[in-house]
């Protein structure tokens, strides 16, 4: 709103970017991020994306309820069970999307 310029490092601190990339490394860094997301809990990622889109038009109470329902659904998946067991065993979970 002020028209003040900021450099990339400050913009990253403000949360405008996930990461600053070194010159020439953007494609490699983007592929690594995509791989990391794809290896994660894809069902839960989909639920999160759905909630983000739906909650733009909700009040806070409805958004909190939607989040609670999404969590309850995600907690019924096999990926949740894998994540829980891996957490207890202090291991990294391997997600399968179910």
Task: State where each predicted segment sits.
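Short C-terminal tail/terminal secondary-structure segment
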Residues: 56, 92-98
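Helix-loop "lid/cap" segments that line or gate small-molecule binding pockets
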Residues: 37, 51-55, 70-75
């Amino acid at each position: 709103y002020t028209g003040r310029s900021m450099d990339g490092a400050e913009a990253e601190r403000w949360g405008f970017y996930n990461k600053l990339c070194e010159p020439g490394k953007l494609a490699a860094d983007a592929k690594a991020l995509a791989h990391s997301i794809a290896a994660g809990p894809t069902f839960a990622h989909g639920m999160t994306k759905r909630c983000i889109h739906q909650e733009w038009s909700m009040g806070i109470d409805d958004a909190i309820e939607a989040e609670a329902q999404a969590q309850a659904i995600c907690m019924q998946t096999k990926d949740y069970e894998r994540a829980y067991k891996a957490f207890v065993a202090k291991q990294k979970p391997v997600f399968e999307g179910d």
